[in-house]
Amino acid sequence: MSDATTDLGAQWREEWAGAQKIKGPSMKNSSVFYRNIEEELDMSRKSGLCFPIHLPSHVSDFSTCDVLGMGHTGALREEFLKELDANPGFYMGAGGSRLLDGTTEYQDSFEKELAKLMGVESALVVHSGYTANQAIFSTVPRSGDVLVYDELMHATALSGMKISLALDQRPFRHNDVEHFIEVMEAVKESTPLVKAGKRCVIVGVESYYSMDGDICPLRELIEAAKEIFPHGNAQFIVDEAHSFGVCGPEGTGFVREQGLNDEVAITMATFTKALSGAGGE
């Protein structure tokens, strides 16, 4: 191990140790507002869970989401500047929300091109994958619908589910097709409106599960859902955050790679990972 790497490790340990110092008792003469904040942070410090922010360094980063390295090559920057020069009327700011005057001609054109690339009816770009997942799972399932989801769905999806009108929410064991079938059969028997095809079962899964490194058995899940709910009211939402840009025709993701794009109602993808950009759709 090089001296530089050793020194960097020692520096990180020193920064971490410094961040664990208890501050609440020294705040007795401060405003209760700031004292309460420090006392709350002290709970994390006592457990060694207060982590300082590190600047990028020369060490190898095995946790990066820049999986294709495009953010580090300089090629993306060059293409961005070329695109900027080719569109002198490009408006740099938002100027307002999308519902007011925040939608530009360039953005509208981009979303149409993206929809064409993905072979879907329409695409909507928001500022992050977190926002995209939260928006989808909080607004698409309606009252009386049932949410069935893989137990390892990302926290962003779970955040949206918490404020969804679909109050009946049931997880199934991770990538377990047999347990998925059990859950879906239970939904069918306990929810007459869903059984009759008058309400929907919204199934949430990820294509690639980044924390576990495995792949969703999407085809098997879809086939099972169609058999259990022949009215076509079992619909899938697939989080493609870690597959968009790395598989499928022209990098369009796992769903299209499997030829299942006509079987999936909504796919969510991010530009922050393989594409080294920002935003989610």
Predicted feature descriptions by range:
Residues R256-E281:
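Active-site PLP attachment segment
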Residues S97, L152, Y208, E240-H242:
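Conserved Walker B
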Residues D3-M92:
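N-terminal "arm"/small-domain region of PLP-dependent enzymes with the aminotransferase-like
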Residues R170, H174-I237:
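Active-site phosphate-binding strand-loop segment of PLP-dependent enzymes
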Residues S128, V148-L165:
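Substrate-binding/gating loop at the entrance of the active-site cleft, primarily
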Residues E78-S128:
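Conserved N-terminal alpha-helix of the aminotransferase class I/II PLP-enzyme fold
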Residues I136-A155, V177, I181:
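Conserved PLP-anchoring active-site segment centered on the Schiff-base-forming lysine
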